[in-house]
Structures are given as structure tokens and as C-alpha cells.
């Protein structure tokens, strides 16, 4: 029968349906960063007081009930004997999709920050790019100047001027057989990775992806219904791909191979002879090549970046790049992909790309408008990656500082702004690298990404972003050394 209940009655009923006790609500509040104590919950349950709006919202979210129902909605009668509310689960397509670069460790860091704790972040490239490095003035000026003309949609593949500039950049990289219709702009490379995987993979199709990888590749391949098969990059060989491992993992279901060059998270740069070996394997097994080259302008030590597409005019290649890293405009969301080589063998796939490109209408038009200026003007990033430049000097410092810590070793990166140190797991008795990252965060307030977040199979690595100034990196390395002096898992 219908009966009017107090707030306390409704709260207790909702707790019973969720099989939650007062202590469970307290733990949930701690996790969510909501300031509510044991005495508060006790008073709500006993009916001595009712919560303020913020706490009411937290309770309704935690208990999966409507906030208006929980508050009584002005005293309206509520029937507690009706069937439980319908709940909505995530799609089963996401069951095997992981993106731990922004996962539990980051959630814990966010909770700590909400509670007033300062976190030393040597993880977030996007935040650090914005806070530490300036976007070139001419890029900002151009966006402001053209903003009034960027209010409508562009062609789905992008503005002509932007694609023309990208095509000319592809020519400088010696990428063969590229015209204006082979260029697609996107809201960052991330959108285009998702689009390219969705257009290619059917259930059961396999795609070779490096380990360690940037996890979006694995996530997008899995979400598209494919199977990511990880080939090993060998730490003992400058993190270059292990060719024998690639050969072992190719089979009749393999459709493509992915390269990340320069590499995130290792900072490796693949020389021409390594790329040629991959081309030879792709040619033998008739594979498509996807090459993520977003860091191609962040190469140090006088090394040259070679685009693998320039070595494979007879294969179908898709090359990805953008302005987020080289021009410090991650928030502008502008990337591109370039189709090259033998496009005749991929006509149907290209039709799928066009369909998906049309479905999202177009990418960010104001950001497209600055591509021509960004690619054609002074490349200010060059000043950062030479001796005396900030990125160069910060790499030198963090590499030496990490290698000086007992139990830590690292391969010196040649490009990008990442280093992927190895931990002596026997020395520190580490069996769970995510727990290591959480313990470091809670003890020393340092945020890193654990190696398994990059689909690395062993719990013995972590990634550091060396974009902060040397004094910040020094503080972080001292705290890490202190932590490892006593840490045992």
C-alpha cells in the first residue's frame, strides 16, 4: 500500500535495496572526495537531520535513486513497495576496452586534489604543455583573425587550405602518391585512430600493435570488434620492434600493423633500416601500415625522422600527425591522417573512411584555419630540442637522475618527451605496478603512469613526462629516491 515516509525511511529503504550499510556510504564518500563523516550519516539514518543539496546528490548517485524521490519532493507521497528502479549498464563492447592512462590512479589523484593535496604531476603531457610552454604567437593571432570566418561547417575532410598545407608537408616527408583528397583532418589524432579502426576491423580480425603502446590504439581496435595482438619492442635494443616476434604473430587474420614512431611511452626513434624490415614483413604478408607520427618534429641529437610510408610506395599506408605536441596546442584538437601508396587495393576501405568522416560532419574549423600558418611559419619547437633548449636539457637531467637511483634503469629517449624507466621488481618485491603508482602517489604526492597502462605485460616499468622544468624534475626524482629507499610491496 502507499504510505508517506520521512527522509530517513526513504534513505534506509534505498540502502537496503543496494545492500549498503552506513560504513559503505562513508567509504563511498571518501572515494568520491565528498566531505561527510560517520556522525552525519548516522544523523541522516536516525532522522535527526537531512542533508544539504550537495550531500543529497551524492547519496542519490551512490544509491541509484532519484534525488527528488529521496528528498520527498516537497512531501509528496512515495510508494516504497514498487519494483526497483531500472538501471543502465555499460555496453558489453567495452568489457575488454582499457584506457588506464586516465584510470584508477588518476581518479585517486583527483580525489586527493579535491581534498586540498598538491600533486606533482609528471604524467599529463596536455596540462604540462599548456602550463609550461607557449603556443606560437602567430598561431594565436591567426585564429583570432579568422574566427569570424569559421562559424560554419567545412568539407568533411577539412578546409582546402589546411589540407593543401598538410599535403605539402607530406611531400617534404617524401610520402608518395598523395593528393588533396587523401588528407583527412580530425579533432586530434585520437578521433582519426578511432575512425580508421572502425572502418577496417570486423569481429575476429587481428591487428599488430606495439607493446608498450599508446593504449588508445588497443582500445579502438578492441571497440571496433578486432583483436589487438601485441608485438614486443625490445628494451635491450633501444626499444626497437622485435622482428622475429612480429613474424611469429602474423597469421591469415592479420589485416594491418601499427607503428608509433617516435614512440610513446619509450621515446624511441626507429631508424631507416628498422622501418625497412617492417615494410618487408608487411609486403610479404600483404598488410596495411598505420603509422602514428605525432611526435615527428620532436627529434633530438641530430637524428632524422623517417616516415615509413616513404619506404612503401607499393603498400597502402595511413600516416597520422598533428599540431598538439609540436605547437603546444593540445586543446585546439587538430590532427590529420594521410592516405598514401597503393590506394587501389583499399578502395572499399576508403569508402568506409569517407562514410564515417561524413557522419561526424567535420572537425574543428577554427583549429583547421591555423594549420597553414603553423606548418609554414617558424618552427619554435626546434629551439626546445637542441642543446640548451628546455626539452633537451630536461631529458638530459631526468635520464641521469633516474639512472642514479638504485634499482632503476632507463634507455635514453631520442624523441618526444617521455622516458620509460625499468624497476627492479625483485629488489622492491613489486608484483603490481598500478599499486606501486598508487603507493607513490599517496606517500610522495607524485603522479606517474604504470607500465601496464601501456599494454606492457610485466609490472616493471612506469612512464615519466619530462616537460616540467628541471627544478620540478629534481624535486620529483629526490622524492622517488627517498620513497624507494624503504618501499617494499
Name the predicted role of every residue range.
Residues 146-280, 297-310, 478-479:
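Conserved core of the PLP fold type I
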Residues 372, 388-402, 410-424:
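Conserved glycine-rich beta-strand-loop-beta hairpin in the small C-terminal domain of fold type I
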Residues 310-389, 399-401, 484:
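Conserved core segment of the aminotransferase class I/II
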Residues 172, 429-431, 439-448, 454-489:
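PLP-dependent enzyme catalytic core of the Aspartate aminotransferase-like
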Residues 46-61, 77:
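Short, basic-rich loop-to-helix N-cap that marks the start of a DNA-contacting helix
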Residues 95-188, 195, 362, 374-377, ...:
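N-terminal small-domain helix-loop-helix segment of the aminotransferase-like
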Residues 31-51, 72-73:
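Recognition helix of helix-turn-helix/homeodomain-like DNA-binding domains
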Residues 1-27:
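A short, Lys/Arg-rich alpha-helix, primarily the initiator
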Amino acid at each position: 500500500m502507499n504510505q508517506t515516509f520521512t527522509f530517513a525511511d526513504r534513505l534506509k529503504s534505498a540502502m537496503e535495496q543496494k545492500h549498503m550499510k552506513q560504513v559503505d556510504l562513508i567509504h563511498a564518500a571518501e572515494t568520491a572526495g565528498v566531505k561527510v563523516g560517520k556522525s552525519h550519516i548516522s544523523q541522516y539514518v536516525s532522522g535527526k537531520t537531512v542533508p544539504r543539496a550537495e550531500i543529497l546528490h551524492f547519496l542519490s548517485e551512490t544509491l541509484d535513486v532519484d534525488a527528488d524521490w529521496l528528498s520527498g519532493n516537497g512531501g509528496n507521497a512515495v510508494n516504497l513497495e514498487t519494483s526497483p528502479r531500472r538501471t543502465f549498464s555499460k555496453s558489453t563492447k567495452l568489457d575488454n576496452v582499457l584506457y588506464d592512462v586516465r584510470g584508477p590512479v588518476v581518479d585517486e589523484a583527483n580525489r586527493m586534489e579535491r581534498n586540498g593535496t598538491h600533486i606533482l604531476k609528471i604524467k599529463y603531457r596536455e596540462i604540462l604543455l599548456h602550463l609550461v610552454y607557449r603556443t606560437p604567437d602567430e598561431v594565436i593571432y591567426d585564429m583570432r583573425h579568422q574566427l569570424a570566418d569559421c562559424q560554419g561547417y567545412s568539407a568533411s575532410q577539412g578546409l582546402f587550405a589546411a589540407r593543401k598545407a598538410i599535403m605539402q608537408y607530406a611531400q617534404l616527408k617524401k610520402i608518395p602518391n598523395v593528393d588533396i583528397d587523401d588528407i583527412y583532418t580530425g579533432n586530434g589524432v585520437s578521433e582519426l585512430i578511432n575512425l580508421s579502426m572502425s572502418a577496417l576491423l570486423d569481429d575476429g580480425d587481428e591487428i599488430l600493435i606495439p607493446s608498450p603502446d599508446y593504449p588508445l590504439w588497443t582500445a579502438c581496435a578492441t571497440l571496433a570488434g578486432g583483436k589487438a595482438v601485441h608485438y614486443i619492442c625490445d628494451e635491450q635494443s633501444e626499444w626497437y620492434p622485435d622482428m622475429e616476434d612480429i613474424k611469429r604473430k602474423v597469421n591469415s587474420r592479420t589485416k594491418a600493423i601499427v607503428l608509433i614512431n617516435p614512440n610513446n611511452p619509450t621515446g624511441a626513434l626507429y631508424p631507416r633500416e628498422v622501418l625497412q624490415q617492417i615494410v618487408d614483413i608487411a609486403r610479404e604478408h600483404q598488410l596495411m601500415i598505420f603509422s602514428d607520427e605525432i611526435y615527428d618534429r620532436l627529434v633530438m641529437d641530430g637524428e632524422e625522422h623517417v616516415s615509413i610510408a616513404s619506404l612503401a610506395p607499393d603498400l597502402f599506408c595511413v600516416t597520422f600527425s598533428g599540431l598538439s605536441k609540436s605547437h603546444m596546442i593540445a586543446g585546439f584538437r587538430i590532427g590529420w591522417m594521410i592516405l598514401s601508396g597503393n590506394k587501389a587495393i583499399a578502395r572499399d576501405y576508403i569508402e568506409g573512411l569517407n562514410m564515417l568522416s561524413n557522419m561526424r560532419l567535420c572537425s574543428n574549423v577554427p583549429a583547421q584555419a591555423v594549420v597553414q600558418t603553423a606548418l609554414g611559419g617558424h618552427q619554435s619547437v626546434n629551439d626546445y630540442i637542441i642543446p640548451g633548449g628546455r626539452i633537451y636539457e630536461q631529458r638530459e637531467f631526468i635520464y641521469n637522475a633516474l639512472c642514479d637511483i638504485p634499482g632503476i634503469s632507463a634507455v635514453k629517449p631520442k624523441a618526444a618527451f617521455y622516458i620509460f624507466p625499468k624497476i627492479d621488481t625483485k629488489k622492491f618485491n613489486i608484483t603490481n605496478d598500478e599499486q606501486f603508482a598508487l603507493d607513490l602517489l599517496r606517500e610522495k604526492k607524485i603522479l606517474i603512469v604504470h607500465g601496464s597502462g601501456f599494454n606492457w605485460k610485466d609490472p616493471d616499468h612506469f612512464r615519466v613526462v619530462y616537460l616540467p622544468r628541471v627544478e620540478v624534475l629534481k624535486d620529483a626524482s629526490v622524492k622517488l629516491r627517498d620513497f624507494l629507499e624503504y618501499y617494499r610491496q
